[in-house]
Curated annotation (Swiss-Prot):
PROSITE patterns: G_CP (PS51721)
Residue positions binding GTP: 212-215, 379-386, 423-426
Record comment regarding domains: In contrast to other GTP-binding proteins, this family is characterized by a circular permutation of the GTPase motifs described by a G4-G1-G3 pattern.
CDD domains in alphabetical order: HSR1_MMR1
Species of the source: Mus musculus
Lineage: Eukaryota, Metazoa, Chordata, Craniata, Vertebrata
InterPro entries for this protein: G_CP_dom, GNL1-like, GTP-bd, P-loop_NTPase
Known EC number: 3.6.5.-
Name under which the protein is recorded: Large subunit GTPase 1 homolog
Catalysis: reaction(s): GTP + H2O = GDP + phosphate + H(+)
Similarity remark: Belongs to the TRAFAC class YlqF/YawG GTPase family. LSG1 subfamily.
Segments forming domain CP-type G: 164-430
Phosphoserine sites (modified residues): 93, 97
UniProt-recorded Gene Ontology molecular function terms: GTP binding; GTPase activity
Keywords from the named record: Cytoplasm, Endoplasmic reticulum, GTP-binding, Hydrolase, Nucleotide-binding, Nucleus, Phosphoprotein, Protein transport, Transport
Length: 644
């Protein structure tokens, strides 16, 4: 055994020394919370202990800049600004949207695409690449200057020069340049400067706008867009790659083969194709059937006349195009104006064979490659360029994906001898938008990569009525409070909460998973399940949405909106905490003293019903004093929850 240590404080000295050492070490390596002031009245011995600063946070950078400028900060009081609830949605008010639209119209001429510099056979590849880089850098600086000076928001345009080189090659080798746009918002996906650039390269080239996904539009909506582009002198063709693919794979293939064999069909047969040949998507099938009864008869004569004018126009313009060729700029402009006056657009959905025949009739002049008509397909990502090629070819020649920007290189495919299709990679061209939420809802930005889900879902709630959302998903969205507008659109939180509870999307804490629900709803909006079609300029956006009312009417006729007796008759409403507390039964209570009930009230129990009173009066144990419970409880303890 070891030597016994002395009881008591034998190690007290060591403990004190150890604590003092630890205290000195802690003060040496940690900062103190003591307030000090730098007087700068002595010699700075730490002037040589410099630290290199290469990166700073935004706050540190701001404070360092303010210190260098000698700026002093003074607290401002009584500078109160009320932030409305709509500010968190990320959407613009009506006044702000009108102001931004005015700025868009004033600066529309600055929206351009990069040009390829002039070159000839004497230009070396190195000189051409350097000239392309210089022009591209100049173009990017111009757009950045436009954003900074005018405070405008541009779409995230393509910043890779190799993609623009693909576009230049497609335009140079194409006789017809087809811009494919989305039928729900054609003006956003249309690039007017691209049409000018095509004419700058060769005046004999033709510009055409192919409105894809046109099966989402009704006959009246297609007619409105046809008239709008006809006034601007732009040739448009209404087309649906998905609907045509379903048609070719369906039971009506024999009818399509007969149409392909007979190219000289009458106008009545071409108009009947619009109503009977194209199978529409699930959401639009009911609305198209009701719209065809009321609208197709109204536009039959117009469509027949427009088809005759289209064929006459293309045949008459072929002769002067062959004779004139590439003339001076003044003659080109005069010829272009003459063509614009004779443009007539049809509003019916064309089939595959009709689309190819229109391509052959549009360009009859001198071709880039003798004996071959080359059609270049350009446009934004995910608008259906590759799907259009696969539909025309009859099988999968180009890979297709729902993610924007899937096609990386242009490729040429021969449909038949003398007709070649050229698929260009999707390019996001510079365009004006009000918010980033519009780019997400229009499919320009990927939904899975969004950071904030509130602005795009709020935009969906503004465009799609409350009743359509409830019918589409089978949910009940909570109603506004009594002091709010009963017709206001639902907020993003109300929609996502109802959708998440219905689908069972919950977080770890038992709350509805709103970001996950937002991705599903936004994908339905981009895919067309939640349909909103932008109208032409000058049209009322609310009156232009024919599908919403037709969808509700079809659901009512089908019996899907019938409510079960005693269920779903009254939707939930946002509770007002003040009203609920004020009118609660606990607040209405008589304060009495004594054991026996007075006028139906007992101390600590409130109102006593007749059934309860009769049960207590049963002579079982009369010696029990049940009324002494909470007899001496003070009122301020009973009603402490009412104290402020």
């Amino acid at each position: 055994m070891g030597r016994r240590r002395a009881p008591g404080g034998g190690s007290l000295g060591r403990v004190l020394i150890r604590q003092q050492t630890q205290r000195s070490r802690s003060h040496r390596h940690t900062d103190s919370w003591l307030h000090t002031s730098e007087l700068n009245d002595g010699y700075d011995w730490g002037r040589l202990n410099l630290q290199s600063v290469t990166e700073q946070s935004s706050l540190e950078d701001f404070l360092a800049t303010a210190e260098l400028a000698g700026t002093e900060f003074v607290a401002e009081k009584l500078n109160i600004k009320f932030v409305p609830p709509e500010a968190r949605t990320g959407l613009l008010s009506f006044e702000e949207s009108q102001r931004i639209k005015k700025l868009h119209e004033e600066n529309r001429q600055f929206l351009c695409i990069p040009r390829r510099p002039n070159w000839d056979r004497k230009t070396s590849p190195e000189e051409l690449k350097q000239a392309e880089k210089d022009n591209f850098l100049k173009w990017r600086r111009q757009l950045v200057r436009l954003e900074e000076e005018q405070k405008l928001i541009l779409t995230p345009f393509e910043r890779n020069l190799d993609f623009w080189r693909q576009l230049w090659r497609v335009i140079e080798r194409s006789d017809i340049v087809v811009q494919i746009v989305d039928a729900r918002n054609p003006l956003l996906f249309r690039c007017e400067d691209l049409e000018c650039y095509v004419k700058e390269i060769d005046a004999a080239k033709e510009n055409v706008i192919l409105i894809n996904k046109a099966d989402l539009l009704t006959a009246e909506q297609r007619f409105a867009w046809a008239v709008h582009f006809e006034k601007e002198g732009v040739k448009v063709i209404f087309w649906s790659a998905l609907a045509e693919t379903d048609h070719l794979n369906g039971d009506l293939k024999e009818e399509v083969d007969s149409v392909a064999g007979d190219t000289n069909k009458t106008e009545s047969e071409s108009s009947s194709l619009d109503a009977n040949e194209i199978p529409h998507r699930d959401l639009i099938s009911l609305s198209e059937e009701s719209a065809s009864d009321s609208g197709d008869s109204k536009y039959e004569d117009c469509q027949e006349d427009e088809e005759e004018d289209w064929q006459t126009c293309s045949e008459e313009d072929s002769v002067p195009e062959e004779e004139e060729g590439c003339n001076a700029d003044s003659e080109t402009q005069n010829r272009k104006n003459a063509e614009n006056q004779q443009v007539n657009n049809d509003s019916y959905l064309v089939s595959k064979q009709e689309l190819l025949e229109l391509f052959k009739k549009l360009h009859t002049g001198k071709k880039v490659k003798d004996g071959q008509l080359t059609v270049g397909l350009v446009g934004y990502p995910n608008v259906g360029k590759s799907s259009t090629i696969n539909t025309i070819m009859g099988n999968k020649k180009v890979s297709v994906s729902a993610t924007p920007g899937h096609t990386k290189h242009f490729q040429t495919l021969y449909v038949e001898p003398g007709l070649c299709l050229c698929d260009c990679p999707g390019l996001v061209m510079p365009s004006f938008v009000s918010t980033k939420a519009e780019m997400i809802c229009n499919g320009i930005l990927p939904i899975d990569q969004m950071r904030d889900h509130v602005p795009p879902v709020s935009l969906v709630c503004q465009n799609i009525p409350r009743r359509v959302l409830e019918v589409t998903y089978g949910i009940n969205i909570i109603k506004p409070r009594e002091d709010e507008d009963p017709y206001r659109p639902p907020t993003s939180e109300e929609l996502l909460t109802a959708y998440g509870c219905m689908r069972g999307f919950m977080t770890a804490h038992g709350q509805p998973d709103q970001p996950r629900s937002a991705r599903y709803i936004l994908k339905d909006y981009v895919g067309g399940k939640l349909l909103y079609c932008h109208p032409p300029p000058g049209k009322d956006p609310v009156a232009f949405q024919h599908q919403h009312q037709q969808l509700l009417e079809s659901k009512v006729k089908g019996g899907e909106l019938r409510l079960q007796p005693g269920k779903g008759r009254k939707a939930k409403q946002i509770e007002n905490v003040v009203d609920k507390t004020f009118f609660h039964q606990e607040n209405v209570r008589a304060l009495t003293k004594g054991v026996q009930a007075v006028m139906g009230y007992k101390p600590g129990h409130g109102l006593v019903t007749a059934a309860a009173a009769s049960a207590e009066n049963v002579p079982g144990k009369p010696w029990k004093k049940h009324g002494n419970r909470n007899k001496k409880e003070k009122s301020r303890r009973l009603y402490k929850h009412l104290d402020v």
